[in-house]
Design a protein with these regions (language model features):
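Non-catalytic signal-transmission and effector/linker regions of two-component phosphorelay proteins
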Residues: 1-13, 19, 26, 44, ...
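Charged docking surfaces used in two-component/phosphorelay signaling
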Residues: 23-31
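Acidic, metal-coordinating helix/loop segments flanking the phosphotransfer/catalytic sites
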Residues: 38-57, 97
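Acidic catalytic/metal-coordinating carboxylates
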Residues: 41, 68-73
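Conserved phosphotransfer cores of two-component systems
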Residues: 50-53, 76-83, 95, 99
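Active-site residues of response regulator receiver
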Residues: 61-62
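Hydrophobic/aromatic residues positioned on beta-strands within the core alpha/beta folds
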Residues: 89-90
């Protein structure tokens, strides 16, 4: 796994309701040099985003409990904080390109670290 340039300067918010999957994603991104914040649902992620200004990438699952899913969260983030890059993931659905905000990327589950890191690089390039 290659470490992206400026990884240490990028804080990632991981939003995943499956504890084991979230822990693995945290480990994967920390191993790649990213600083990571985690949330178990979109509502928790929204509260974190409102209280912090250092999030550079949102890495979110689509299906999760709470008042909004990952698509709704990503759309709200793209509207309110357009500088935050979006990487969306799911093992159950494959969104149409129009469902992913303009500067967002989709990575299907199960994913490998290199797939996620490439998506981060592409999202950051937009």
């Amino acid at each position: 796994m290659s470490i992206p340039p400026n990884a240490s300067a990028t804080r990632v918010l991981i939003v995943e309701d499956e504890d084991l999957v979230r822990m693995m994603a945290v480990d994967m991104l920390e191993d790649a040099g990213f600083a990571v914040v985690e949330a178990a649902c979109a509502d928790e992620a929204w509260a974190i985003l409102q209280s912090r200004s250092d999030i550079g990438v949102l890495f979110t699952d689509i299906e999760m409990p709470g008042s909004m899913n990952g698509f709704v969260l990503a759309a709200r983030v793209a509207e309110r904080w357009p500088q935050i890059r979006l990487v969306i993931t799911s093992g159950r659905c494959r969104p149409a390109p129009r469902d992913v905000p303009d500067h967002g990327m989709f990575v299907p589950k199960p994913y490998l670290a290199d797939q996620v890191l490439r998506a981060f690089e592409r999202a950051r390039a937009h």
